Amino acid sequence: MLKQVQKGFTLIELMIVIAIIGILAAIALPAYQDYVARSQMSEAFNLAGGQKGAVSEYYSDKGVWPADNAAAGIAATVNGKYVNSVVVSAAGTNGVITATMKSTGVAKGVQGKTLALKGTANDGSFSWECSSNADAKYLPSSCRNAATPTPTP
């Protein structure tokens, strides 16, 4: 009589594979969630950054920072898929562009958070300092630096 050869995986082999997949998922899921939050926060940085030219130009022409979006010559409502609003304001000797994230439909770590670009005039050029109440790991790398110079438009 010939013995039958068993084919396939044993139960212990399948359990080991499932355990390995679980460990990999436990590592990958938080990293993916952080990636999603960073990509959503970059929309706020890009929308706010897109207003720097208009705000700088207003200051160059008038010698004061614009009080609101209308004064800066930008749309009253600036928003995006993840950004609720982008608002221009004057704060003392600085111009401020503030982007506020939506409260729903965005990653939990950035819900309702704000990102502000504070402009300072420096003898014909401007520097922009980025600040946010969101965790630094969600901010674009260029926003983690103290100030980035912007030439006069």
UniProtKB/Swiss-Prot annotation:
Which chain regions cross the lipid bilayer? 9-29
Q: How does it sit in the membrane?
A: Single-pass membrane protein
**Pfam family example for this protein?**
Pilin
> Which top-level group of life is the source organism from?
Bacteria
Query: Which UniProt keywords are given for this protein, alphabetically ordered?
Result: Disulfide bond, Fimbrium, Membrane, Methylation, Transmembrane, Transmembrane helix
Disulfide bond sites: C130-C143
Q: Which residues form the propeptide?
A: 1-8
Any single Gene Ontology cellular-component annotation: type IV pilus
Query: Which compartments does it reside in?
Result: Fimbrium; Membrane
List, in alphabetical order, the GO biological process terms annotated in this UniProt record. cell adhesion; type IV pilus-dependent motility
Q: Which residues carry this modification: N-methylphenylalanine?
A: F9
Fetch the PANTHER family from UniProt.
Answer: GENERAL SECRETION PATHWAY PROTEIN G (PTHR30093), PREPILIN PEPTIDASE-DEPENDENT PROTEIN D (PTHR30093:SF34)
**Which family is this protein grouped under?**
Belongs to the N-Me-Phe pilin family.
- Put simply, this protein is called Fimbrial protein EcpC
Organism lineage reads as: Bacteria, Pseudomonadati, Pseudomonadota, Betaproteobacteria, Neisseriales
